[in-house]
C-alpha cells in the first residue's frame, strides 16, 4: 500500500505573545514484558471499571463524558477548579484546572512553604502575568516576600548558563530550604525551574504555573526537569515533583496560534498511544480547539492530564510504561537537536516525529493504513508539520538518536504503534530495515 504524503508542511512564522489585555474515570492498562528491551502496552479508553484507588487518582469536578463542541467562543467564568490528582503516595499532588484560577489566591498559598518565594519566568510572560502571580502569592499574606528572575525566552536558552541565573538570584537573595520556587511560563521555564529547585540546597519546594498548552497537557505534570546539552535534548536533569500544578486556562488567551498548535501535538499523542475515544473526540473537535473554544480546550487539557497522571502514578521514573508517552519524541528530539534548538517548536518536531513513528509502525506491519491516514490528517488539521525539515539527513537522525535517553546497552528503543488505535509498544525488538526505510523515505540523503 502506498505510504502517505511525505511533503514537509510549511511552518508558520514565529509570533510573539499577544498581551490581552465529574466524575473522572481511568484507563485500564495491561502490560506484557516480552524481553528486557520491549514493553507492550494495551490501553483501553478511560473507563469506569478501575478500582477505587485509581478513581481517587483522577478526581475531577467536571464530567469525563466527551461532549461534541461547537466552534463558537464562550466567555470563561471563574469557578471552582477541576482537580486531577497525581498519586505518588506521600508525594502526591493536585493539578488544578480552570478559568480565573490566578484570581483565587488560596490555591497557590496553600502550597507555599516558608515565607520566601522565587518566581522564575521569562521575558515574554513576565509583562503579562508576573504581577498577577505576585498578587496571588501575597494577597492577604503580607508575611510572604517574593523575588523574581526573568530569563530570556526560547528553547535555545534551556542550558546551564541560563540555569545559573536562577541560582545566582536565589543565592543573592539568601533563600533557604524553606523557600518555594514558582515556575511561571511554558515547558522551558518549567523544566529549568524544576531542575533548579531539585538542585538548590539539594532540593526545595516548587510549584508549576504553566501558561502554554504544551506545558499544561504534558511537561508540567510528572516531575521531569532538566536542561539541554549541545549534543542532545534533556540529557541533564532530574525527576522532581512539584507541590501542585495550577492551570489557569485564561493564560491561553495570550498564546500565539503557533504555540497553541504545538501543544496540540501532545494532545494527539495521548489518543494515539492509549486513549482511542479521546482521539475520536479530537477528530470531531479539532476545529473547536483551533478556534480556542474554552470548553473544548478545558476538556482536552483535563483528559490529557488524566492520562498523564495515571501513567506517572504507575511508573514515575520511566522504567517502562511512562516511556510510551514519548511517541515521536526520539525522531522529534533529533529534529530539534539537528535543526537547531528553537528553529521548530517542540510540538512541531514531535508532530513530524509521530508521523515518522507511525510510518515505521506501518512498515513493520503492526498497524493498518487507516491509522496512518488518521494520524496524518489530524496533525494537518492542527496545522502541524508532517515531515522533518528538508535539511535533516539520515546521518543526522542516526547520530542524535544514538545518544537518546531510551538507548539501553547500545540498543535504540522506540515507541511504536501496534494493533488497534490506542495501543503501542516500547521496544528494541524491531526490524532495523524498517527504521532505515522510514529515515530514507523522509530524508533526501
From Swiss-Prot:
Q: Which UniProt keywords apply?
A: Amino-acid biosynthesis, Aromatic amino acid biosynthesis, Chloroplast, Lyase, Metal-binding, NAD, Plastid, Transit peptide
The residues forming the transit peptide are 1-68
Q: Pathway of this protein?
A: Metabolic intermediate biosynthesis; chorismate biosynthesis; chorismate from D-erythrose 4-phosphate and phosphoenolpyruvate: step 2/7
Kindly give the InterPro entries that the UniProt entry links to this protein.
Dehydroquinate_synthase, DHQ_synth_AroB, DHQS/DOIS_N, DHQS_C
Please describe how the activity of this protein depends on temperature: Optimum temperature is 55 degrees Celsius.
Which transformation does this protein catalyse, written as a reaction?
Answer: 7-phospho-2-dehydro-3-deoxy-D-arabino-heptonate = 3-dehydroquinate + phosphate
Its biological function? Catalyzes the second step in the shikimate pathway.
Can you say what this protein is called?
A: 3-dehydroquinate synthase, chloroplastic
Name of the encoding gene: DHQS
